[in-house]
C-alpha cells in the first residue's frame, strides 16, 4: 500500500487559495446586491439568511467531511472508530444510519474544527430510501471533503457518483473498508482497479484501506478478542489533506454554494421583473387598442410613430435597470419591428386587416375593432420580445 512519508508537510498553494477565497467573497457580495432588488421581503430575508451562513462558514466555519456510500459499507463504523465513540443507530437489515448525524472534533494542528457528517446509505430499496439518498447526495455536494466508502469493488453507479462529485470540484478519498474479509492480494487488486477507473479524472483521488469493525476470518491471524480497528491511515490522510488544502477546499465549496444561491436570487429577480413587465405591456395594450378604436390608423404606422410604444420601451428598460435615451428607444423599436417583419410576424398579424371590411357602417365598426385587437396583439409581441432582449 502506498504511504506518504511526511504526514503534515505544508504544500499549500497560497496564491490559488487567495484567488478562491477572494472569488467566494466577491460572489457573496454579489448575492447581497441581487437580494436588495427583491421586493418580496420574506424571500429576500430568507436568501440573506443563507448568504450570511455562507459568510460565517467562510470566516470561522468547520471543515465539513462527509461519509458517503452504500448502507452496508461501514460508514458509521468508520465514524465510530475515528471519533473513538459509539455513534449512530443500529439496523439489522440495511445500514446503521437512518438520518444525517454530525460530530465535531478538534485537531490542534488544523486551523479549524472538523465536522464529520455520517449520512444514510445509498441503494436502499424504498421510497423513503430514495428520499434519504437525495439528501445524502446534497450533503456530499455541500462538503469540503468526501469520504466515499466501499466494501467491495466499485460498481457503475458509484463510479457515476464519483464523476458527478468531481464535476463539482469535490475532493474525494475513497475508503476501501472490510479489508480483513479479503486477502491482501484481493485488496490490492481492487485498489488497483479503483485507481485505474478513476485515474482518468483530472482530480487526484486517494484510495485508503481500512478495517472499521474487525471480524474473524481466514485472513486474520489474531484472536477475535485481540482484533482492533485499523483506520489510522485514513485519519492521517484526512489530516494531511485538510492541513495542506483545507482552506482552499472550504473556499471552493463556499464559492460553489454561493454561485448556486446567486442563481436562486437571480431567478427571483427575473420572476419579479417578468410580472412587472407584463403589467406594463398590458397597460400599453389597452392604451393602444383604445386609441386606434377611436382614431383608426394602420397598426405598423402606429407602432413606429406613436410615443406610446416608445414610452413602453422606456418603462421596460427601467425595470431591467438598462439606461436608454429616447433616441435609443426609437432606434430599438425600429430595429425590433424590422426583425419581426422579416420573420413574418407582422405580416401574419396584419393579414386579418382586410380593406374590404370598410364597405359598410357595420363593417367599418368591425374593422376598427379588429385593428384595435391586432394593434394590441402587436404591442404584446413587441413587449415580450423586449423582455427577452433586456433579460439577456
Residue ranges and their predicted role:
Residues 4-121, 378, 384:
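Conserved G1/Walker A P-loop phosphate-binding module
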Residues 65-71, 269-308, 337-345:
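Transmembrane alpha-helical segments and their cytosolic interface motifs
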Residues 107-110, 134-207:
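Conserved C-terminal guanine-recognition region of P-loop GTPase G domains, centered on the G4
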Residues 122-129, 181:
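Flexible beta-alpha connector loops of hexameric P-loop NTPases
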Residues 180-250:
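Canonical P-loop GTPase G-domain recognition
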Residues 246-276, 280:
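Active-site helix-to-loop segments that bind/position phosphate- or nucleotide-bearing substrates
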Residues 318-353:
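Hydrophobic alpha-helical transmembrane segments and adjacent short intramembrane/lumenal linkers
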Residues 360-392:
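Charge-biased C-terminal accessory regions appended to nucleic-acid-, cytoskeletal NTPase
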Amino acid at each position: 500500500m502506498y504511504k506518504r512519508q511526511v504526514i503534515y508537510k505544508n504544500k499549500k498553494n497560497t496564491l490559488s487559495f487567495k484567488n478562491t477565497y477572494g472569488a467566494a467573497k466577491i460572489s457573496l457580495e454579489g448575492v447581497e446586491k441581487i437580494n436588495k432588488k427583491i421586493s418580496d421581503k420574506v424571500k429576500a430575508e430568507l436568501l440573506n439568511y443563507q448568504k450570511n451562513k455562507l459568510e460565517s462558514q467562510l470566516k470561522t466555519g468547520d471543515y465539513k467531511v462527509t461519509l458517503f456510500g452504500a448502507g452496508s459499507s461501514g460508514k458509521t463504523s468508520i465514524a465510530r472508530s475515528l471519533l473513538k465513540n459509539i455513534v449512530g443507530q443500529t439496523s439489522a437489515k440495511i445500514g446503521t444510519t437512518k438520518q444525517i448525524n454530525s460530530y465535531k472534533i478538534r485537531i490542534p494542528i488544523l486551523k479549524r474544527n472538523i465536522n464529520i457528517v455520517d449520512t444514510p446509505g445509498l441503494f436502499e430499496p424504498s421510497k423513503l430510501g430514495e428520499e434519504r439518498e437525495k439528501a445524502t447526495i446534497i450533503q456530499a455536494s455541500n462538503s469540503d471533503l468526501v469520504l466515499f466508502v466501499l466494501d467491495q469493488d466499485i460498481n457503475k453507479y458509484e463510479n457515476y457518483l464519483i464523476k458527478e462529485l468531481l464535476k463539482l470540484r469535490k475532493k474525494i478519498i475513497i475508503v476501501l473498508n472490510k479489508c480483513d474479509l479479503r486477502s491482501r492480494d484481493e485488496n490490492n487488486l481492487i485498489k488497483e482497479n479503483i485507481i485505474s477507473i478513476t485515474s482518468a479524472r483530472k482530480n487526484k483521488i486517494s484510495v485508503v484501506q481500512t478495517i472499521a469493525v474487525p471480524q474473524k476470518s481466514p485472513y486474520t491471524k489474531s484472536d477475535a478478542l485481540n482484533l482492533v480497528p485499523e483506520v489510522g491511515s485514513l485519519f492521517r490522510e484526512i489530516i494531511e489533506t485538510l492541513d495542506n488544502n483545507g482552506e482552499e477546499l472550504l473556499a471552493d465549496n463556499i464559492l460553489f454554494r454561493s454561485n448556486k444561491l446567486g442563481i436562486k436570487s437571480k431567478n427571483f429577480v427575473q420572476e419579479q421583473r417578468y410580472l412587472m413587465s407584463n403589467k406594463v405591456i398590458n397597460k400599453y395594450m389597452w392604451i393602444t387598442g383604445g386609441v386606434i378604436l377611436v382614431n383608426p390608423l394602420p397598426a405598423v404606422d402606429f407602432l413606429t410613430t406613436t410615443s406610446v410604444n416608445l414610452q413602453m420601451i422606456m418603462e421596460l428598460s427601467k425595470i431591467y435597470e438598462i439606461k436608454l435615451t429616447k433616441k435609443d428607444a426609437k432606434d430599438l423599436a425600429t430595429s425590433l419591428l424590422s426583425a419581426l417583419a422579416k420573420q413574418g410576424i407582422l405580416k401574419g398579424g396584419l393579414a386579418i386587416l382586410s380593406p374590404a371590411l370598410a364597405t359598410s357602417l357595420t363593417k367599418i365598426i368591425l374593422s376598427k375593432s379588429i385593428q384595435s385587437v391586432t394593434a394590441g396583439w402587436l404591442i404584446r409581441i413587441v413587449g415580450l420580445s423586449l423582455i427577452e432582449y433586456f433579460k439577456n
